[in-house]
Amino acid sequence: MARYTGPKAKLSRREGTDLFLKSARRSLADKCKLDSKPGQHGRTSGARTSDYGNQLREKQKVKRIYGVLERQFRRYFAEADRRKGNTGEKLLQLLESRLDNVVYRMGFGSTRAEARQLVSHKAILVNGQTLNVPSAQIKSGDVITIREQSKKQVRIAEALSLAEQSGFPTWVAVDAKKFEGTFKQVPDRADISGDINESLIVELYSR
């Protein structure tokens, strides 16, 4: 299954919430109607969405937020289910610990897609070593750095400047002048932003 490459705003409208696929710092709320479905006038339906439909919709939303395809998402859920604790919370923690997401949270990319591209293009160092696997799991204490040659990229500087203005998550420490950040710890559920109801995903996979 290929990644979606169409209009990002359409995906946010489909889910009824801003997925921040275009920018983490600029909301789409002022640009388009997030409470209406894609289409000329917004498709409507008189039928009430079933429990299964709501569960499936929530899974699709989270997949789109993190840019993960179905097979990989199932693997994340299976791993979360094996771990002790709340399965839904563990799932989100695994997704948040992906290298591309950490690069995004540190403000080096304005979106997760842009952060993923930086990783794939070998612009990212982890503990001083090039790592070009977006799905790599980052551990507490790992240091993320922009490769020296890539520090000149205007898009990185602009994304970092915007991130500084809006603030960084508490579970990362960023030195913008050095283009460097430290993954302090796996975030608690309360530290993970986003309008996500992970319990619906757990219910879906428990059917």
UniProtKB/Swiss-Prot annotation:
Native species of this protein? Cupriavidus pinatubonensis (strain JMP 134 / LMG 1197)
KW rRNA-binding (keyword) present: yes
Start and end residues of each S4 RNA-binding domain: 97-160
As recorded in Swiss-Prot or TrEMBL, the protein's gene is named rpsD
* Residue segments, region Disordered: 33-54
Recorded protein name is Small ribosomal subunit protein uS4
Q: TM spans, by residue?
A: none
Cited function: One of the primary rRNA binding proteins, it binds directly to 16S rRNA where it nucleates assembly of the body of the 30S subunit. With S5 and S12 plays an important role in translational accuracy.
One biological process GO term for this chain?
Answer: translation
